[in-house]
Amino acid sequence: MAEFLHTMVRITDPGRSRAFYEALGFEFERDMDIVRNGELEATNYFYGIGDSRSVLELTYNHDGRTYDLGSGYGHIALALDDLEASLAALKEQGIEPEREPYRVREGGSLLCFVRDPDGYRIELIDRSGK
C-alpha cells in the first residue's frame, strides 16, 4: 500500500512563505540544509498540519535561480477550522482571496482561493460549518 508523504514547492523568500503557511495552521517540524561540494545549495523547511503524517516541504535554493509555476499545477486544498480567522491572519500579510468566500452548492462548505507568496494557488475550505 502506498502512503502520501509530502508535497514540495520551491520558494523565493523563506520568511514570507513560512509566515504564510504558519498563518494557515501549519506547524514547523524541522529544516535541513543541502550541501554539495562544500556549498550550501538549498534549505528545506518541513511543515506538518493536524494529525496528518504527510508534510509540506518548502525548498529555498540559495543560488538565486528563478522558477516557472508551469501549466500543469492546479492547487493545493486545505480544510481549515476557521476560514474567517485564517483569512484575517493572511490579510495582515497583505494577502487577499481571489474573490470573497463562496459555496459551490447550497449547504456546502465555504471556500475561497488565495495565492501564496510565490504564486501557488491554495484552496481554503472552511470545515467549521459556518
Predicted features along the sequence, with ranges:
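Eukaryotic phosphotyrosine signaling hubs
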Residues: 4-6, 72-76
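Short amphipathic alpha-helices within nucleic acid-binding modules
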Residues: 20, 83-89
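Vicinal oxygen chelate
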Residues: 31-34, 45-46, 78, 87-130
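Short, charged/polar surface micro-motifs in flexible loops or helix N-caps
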Residues: 50-54, 63-65, 83-85
